């Protein structure tokens, strides 16, 4: 496998002054996010991309459109690549949840893999949604591919490759506009990854 999978997190979004839970809430890129996407475009300008698999949330679509502007690359929107659904916690600040739902807040912190937000999904459920799609992308492409997704989605993919538990996946840093390169190591006979931007 000489091909590479470039796993990208979308550019920055504007969530206001307070840190909020944002999963499937459909927010556009901020001005800073657009600048980050333009830097990604420059990074990828000389890298051949066969296809792009993109979360249908607008922040990912915008990021992919900027990266691939004026390039004849097929873009495939995949609902399975959407961010974790945080249900009733969507758009609520961390401080609000901690204040009004202290038991749930504590429970999520202690059981991050299995905790399901009311009306949402757990990271374990997210992994079950994302990994089969990632495996299909990996097996069914012959050349370099781009995946534009979200911090949660990227972490479940990377933690799966690195054999890291969901409980420890937040140790994997996924800044806005970051790039992870996934490749096959012939010597070790396994899939590897590294953050390159």
Predicted regions and their residues:
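Glycine-rich phosphate-binding loop signature in dinucleotide/nucleotide-binding domains
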Residues: 45-48, 137-144
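Short, well-ordered beta-to-alpha junction loops that form the rim of enzyme active sites
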Residues: 11, 55-57, 80, 148-152
């Amino acid at each position: 496998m000489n091909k590479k999978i470039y796993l990208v997190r979308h550019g920055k979004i504007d969530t206001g002054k307070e840190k909020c839970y944002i999963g499937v809430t459909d927010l556009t890129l901020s001005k800073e996010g657009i600048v980050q996407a333009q830097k990604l475009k420059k990074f990828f300008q000389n890298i051949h991309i066969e296809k792009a698999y993109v979360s249908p949330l607008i922040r990912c679509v915008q990021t992919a459109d900027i990266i691939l502007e004026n390039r004849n690359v097929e873009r495939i929107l995949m609902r399975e690549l959407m961010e974790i659904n945080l249900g009733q916690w969507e758009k609520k600040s961390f401080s609000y949840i901690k204040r009004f739902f202290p038991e749930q807040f504590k429970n999520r912190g202690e059981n991050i893999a299995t905790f399901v937000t009311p009306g949402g999904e757990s990271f374990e459920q997210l992994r079950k949604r994302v990994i089969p799609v990632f495996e299909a992308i990996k097996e069914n492409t012959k050349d370099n591919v781009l995946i534009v997704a979200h911090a949660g989605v990227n972490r479940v993919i990377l933690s799966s490759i690195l054999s890291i538990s969901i409980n420890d996946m937040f140790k994997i840093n996924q800044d806005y506009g970051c790039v992870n390169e996934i490749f096959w190591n012939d010597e070790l006979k396994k899939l590897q990854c590294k953050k390159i931007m």
